[in-house]
Each structure stands twice: as structure tokens, then as C-alpha cells.
Amino acid sequence: MSLKIEIIKDKILSDNYFVLRNITYDLTRKNGEVIRHKREVYDRGNGATILLYNREKQSVVLIRQFRVATWVNGNPDGRLIETCAGLLDNDAPEVCIRKEAIEETGFAVGEVKKLFELYMSPGGVTELVYFFIAEYTDAQRANAGGGVEDEDIDVLEIPFEQALEMIKTGEIQDGKALILLQYLQISGLMA
């Protein structure tokens, strides 16, 4: 028997930049018991992320940018080392991530490989993130990167082993980066 869900109330609390909803629903459990829940759900749309890697140089491209949510949560300068990422808006995931790669890292990558789709915070955020990797070369640099006009992004080309060490030391705290770096490690692509 699958779970039965009945929406009792769905109220929009904010529709400023993204949509924050307060949803009251009844959930009928497998044993027939009905439980009422009240949850806030943040709908920011779906996104995509990519890790660029170079086997010959044994390097990866990451970015560093200010993230207000991390600053609010105690990150002293609010800057986070991440993989290149962006919201899909109305684009297909691969189209989105190619645009983001050029805007944020400056690299116009060739073949991109979709790995998987993951919910990163399913308890309250609707976002489904599409994960990609792509090999890059210096010849693919189209511009300096750094993002669009309202972004202040540092492009970081880092030795792969150093990036893995940065996870251990806590310098990399972004879940997307951790997942993609560890994928690259276990896949053997950098061996």
C-alpha cells in the first residue's frame, strides 16, 4: 500500500524571489493511521551543477563566492568553495550548465556527462539538482569567468588531490562539490 496524501491547506507565505509555502496535509500511513502535518516548503526551482576536471594536469575547477545563508549560519566571511551551478529557469539541465560553466568558470566545455539527479534538502526545499562532469583543457577557456554583473566569483583551478584534502580540512563545505569530487575519486577518471 502506498502512502495517501491529502492537502488540507496550501498558503503562500512569500512570493518575493522564490516561493515559500505553508502546507497542511494529512498523511495516511501504511497501517491506516492518519497523521496531520504542517510544513513550510521552499520552491526555488531546479538546478544543475558541474565539476570540470583535467586528467593531464590532475586538476579541477571550482569557484568561490559569497553565500548569505552560510554567513547567517556562522561562516565568518560567507564565502564558500563550490562547484559551478545555477538554476535551470526554463532551460534543459545540460543547456543550463553549459551557460553557467562559461559565465562562472570561463570554460566552454565540450562533452558533458550527466551523472544523476539528487534532492539536496528534501525536508523543506523542492529543488532537484542535476549533477554533471566535464573534462576541460586550457584551450577551452573562453573568458576569465567570474559570473554575471551581480556575482563576485573567484575561479579556482586546484590540484585534484588538494581538493580532496580540502574536504578533510573543512575548506570545502559545499555538498555539491563534495559529492562530485568523491565521484571523480571513486570513478577512477583521475587515476
Swiss-Prot record:
Nucleoside diphosphate sugar hydrolase that hydrolyzes GDP-mannose as its preferred substrate, yielding GMP and mannose-1-phosphate. InterPro entries: NDP_pyrophosphatase, NUDIX_hydrolase-like_dom_sf, NUDIX_hydrolase_dom. Keywords: Hydrolase, Magnesium, Metal-binding. Its EC number is 3.6.1.-. It catalyses: GDP-alpha-D-mannose + H2O = alpha-D-mannose 1-phosphate + GMP + 2 H(+). GO terms for molecular function: hydrolase activity, acting on acid anhydrides, in phosphorus-containing anhydrides; metal ion binding. It comes from Enterobacter sp. (strain 638). Homodimer. Mg(2+) 1 binds at residues 85, 104. This is GDP-mannose pyrophosphatase. Residues 43-180 form the Nudix hydrolase domain. The keyword Transcription does not apply. The gene is nudK. GDP-alpha-D-mannose binds at residues 17, 38-40, 67, 85-87, 104, 127, 150-151, 176. In the dimer, the N-terminal domains are swapped between the two monomers, such that residues of both chains contribute to the active site. CDD domains: NUDIX_GDPMK.
